[in-house]
Amino acid sequence: PAPESGFIRDP
């Protein structure tokens, strides 16, 4: 999924 505010999660 797309990154959130300042937080990158695995796709």
Swiss-Prot record:
Disulphide linkage map: none
Any one GO biological process: neuropeptide signaling pathway
Domain of life (superkingdom): Eukaryota
GO CC entries: extracellular region
Keywords: Neuropeptide, Secreted
Localization per record: Secreted
Entry coiled-coil feature ranges: none
Family designation: Belongs to the FARP (FMRF amide related peptide) family.
Record function comment: FMRFamides and FMRFamide-like peptides are neuropeptides.
Protein name, entry field: Extended FMRFamide-10
Organism from which the protein derives: Austrophasma rawsonvillense
Organism classification: Eukaryota, Metazoa, Ecdysozoa, Arthropoda, Hexapoda
